[in-house]
């Protein structure tokens, strides 16, 4: 197995039709902290070295217009139920309440952002410390 050069950070970029609405959703509803404002693209700290970039769509870049997007933005936490209650208090409508997925051994829930991107709050249900990426 070869060793690759170090990766310092990771950013997932999502296009939005309305940067102001997405900014309000991710800042006010999810409570993410703005890390870098580039005008038409805003980058938020998710955790440690993980970031989310929201970019205003241009005529050449089209975000999904329906709920069939293949992107899932997953936030991993031990506190799935706490996040569920926190977001319900902020009037977030869930597509799926917290449930155990036995196939993948995860506990999770789903909702969508203003552009229709699917967001998952998830906990790995494993006793194997090696696989528990939240610790």
Summary of predicted features, one role per range:
Residues 26:
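Terminal peptide-recognition signature
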Residues 31-37, 94-97:
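Short secondary-structure junctions
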Residues 1, 30, 59-62, 96:
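A generic local structural motif
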